[in-house]
Amino acid sequence: MLLSSIAQHLKLPFFGEDLELDSMNELALSLPSQLTFAINKKYSQELESSKSKAFLIIDTLVENLPKESSYIICPDVSISMAQATKLFNKRPIEPQLPSATIGEGSMIDSMVRVENGTCIGSNVIVMAGAYIGANCVIGDDTTIYPNVTIYRDTIIGKECIIHAGVVIGADGFGFSHTKEGEHIKIYQNGNVIIEDCVEIGANCAIDRAVFNSTIIRRGTKLDNFIHIAHNCDIGEHSIFVAQTGVGGSTKLGRNCVVSGQSAFSDHLNIAPFSTFSARSGVTKSIEKSGGVYSGFPLMNHKEWKRLQVKIARLND
């Protein structure tokens, strides 16, 4: 898509060369063929070192652009970014893609729908009522139970188990907000990657990323009714007990243990080998690995136990 076409859709002028762009990405990860954006002055240094050649920016950041950049000056970059994501959004069904392929020894129930462009490996089992969207990859020896929904572009590794009712790749919950209180959808143009030997319990929901990938890494086990929001990165061999929720763009290191009904805020970084007791409320990043935590606000588990003793004695 030409930058001039994007500018026309946004009803804003563009400056510089009229570049051909194939997608969007966040500033730190953007490539020369991608449109990116900088919402405020906080991103001035990232802007100067960006590999992208096309930008949505506020006027005060023009001086920070790399040489020979093309750009659109936006009164509200957040709104313009949301509007631009719609232009790069892929259709859920693409008839022009080649027919799906199914590996040797796989058993696909007659009540399963598999869209074009999808590749299913060997010895895969897909049970009745499942839906697999366009351009997905399902690894060898994976089992998909009834009524699982897998949206387009999802990649699932080998020897995974996906239990009934799971939804993988639905849109992340992302909106930009106008001054008038309207909510402008940020189209989620990334995907979900499930690495090898992952088990996902019944009725879990794992949202697709805005631009790149939501990742569940090798060997991780999810209990039932768990929500993983867009852009999350869940470290390998982690365990999540039922009814846990992880906010967008939060990253957990390997071998974390998260007990039931715990919740994580967005944009956190959690150190490897961290353990959280039931109903933990995690609102800040954790840098030290191997810690055990409880409560809300979150605290060291031993401290939390001492606090519970003191609370129990308040009426004495």
UniProtKB/Swiss-Prot annotation:
Keyword Transferase: yes
Cellular component, GO, one term: membrane
Catalytic residues in the record: H230 (proton acceptor)
Enzymatic class: transferase
Record-listed E.C. numbers: 2.3.1.191
Superkingdom of this protein's organism: Bacteria
Catalytic activity of the protein: a UDP-3-O-[(3R)-3-hydroxyacyl]-alpha-D-glucosamine + a (3R)-hydroxyacyl-[ACP] = a UDP-2-N,3-O-bis[(3R)-3-hydroxyacyl]-alpha-D-glucosamine + holo-[ACP] + H(+)
Entry-linked SUPFAM superfamilies: Trimeric LpxA-like enzymes
Keywords, sorted A to Z: Acyltransferase, Lipid A biosynthesis, Lipid biosynthesis, Lipid metabolism, Repeat, Transferase
Subunit annotation: Homotrimer.
Protein name, per record: UDP-3-O-acylglucosamine N-acyltransferase 2
Organism of provenance: Sulfurimonas denitrificans (strain ATCC 33889 / DSM 1251) (Thiomicrospira denitrificans (strain ATCC 33889 / DSM 1251))
